[in-house]
């Protein structure tokens, strides 16, 4: 859904009602209700599909939780933001992607990718990302330098 890391970490099953995931965004205080039917065509998953995958055999109020006990947390405990970031980086590094001269992707860059993909689908990404104005959202419309900007010249 392109939500911020802290908001993802804080999501609870109790935030779901009326077929929407309700989020009060940490950073801005924006209140958004995202339909569970929201689908990202690029991966063919809806928010409902993601929520269903969060339900497992560990009882937890949190969507993102530990499914087994570790030395750091009990089963069902909330996974904090720094743990999500650290494990994203570990998974990214295990993928052994050649980033060339660029820097490896960060967890936060998924927010930018989500913005671009949902915008292609016609979703109002300013509202989805919880921004007050379009300029904030436009900063997320970055493809890591993959596309070229063509200079247009007038015909004389």
Predicted regions and their residues:
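Short, basic (Lys/Arg/His-rich) helix/loop patches that form interaction surfaces
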Residues: 1, 85-127, 131-135
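Active-site/catalytic core of tyrosine-dependent DNA strand-transfer enzymes
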Residues: 37-101
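Conserved beta-strand positions that form and line the central face of beta-propeller blades
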Residues: 22, 63, 106-109, 139
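Exposed loop/turn and edge beta-strand positions of beta-sandwich/beta-sheet ligand-binding modules
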Residues: 30, 58, 109
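Conserved tyrosine-mediated DNA breakage-rejoining catalytic core shared by Y-recombinases
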Residues: 3-53
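Key DNA-contact positions within bacterial/archaeal DNA-binding proteins
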Residues: 6, 82, 135
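N-terminal/domain-start segments enriched in small and hydrophobic, helix-friendly residues
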Residues: 82-95, 142-156
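Catalytic-site neighborhood detector that most strongly recognizes the C-terminal catalytic loop/helix
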Residues: 25-29, 129-155
């Amino acid at each position: 859904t392109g939500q911020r890391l802290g908001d993802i970490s804080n999501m609870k099953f109790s935030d779901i009602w009326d077929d929407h995931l309700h989020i009060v965004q940490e950073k801005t205080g924006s209140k958004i209700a995202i339909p569970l039917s929201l689908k990202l065509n690029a991966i063919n998953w809806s928010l409902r599909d993601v929520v269903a995958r969060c339900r497992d055999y560990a009882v937890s109020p949190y969507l993102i939780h530990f499914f087994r006990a570790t030395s750091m947390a009990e089963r069902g405990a909330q996974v904090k933001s720094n743990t999500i970031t650290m494990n994203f980086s570990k998974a990214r590094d295990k993928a052994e992607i050649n980033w060339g001269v660029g820097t490896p992707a960060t967890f936060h860059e998924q927010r930018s990718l989500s913005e671009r993909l949902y915008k292609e689908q016609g979703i109002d990404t300013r509202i989805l990302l919880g921004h007050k104005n379009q300029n904030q959202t436009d900063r997320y419309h970055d493809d890591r330098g993959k596309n070229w900007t063509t200079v247009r010249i007038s015909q004389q």
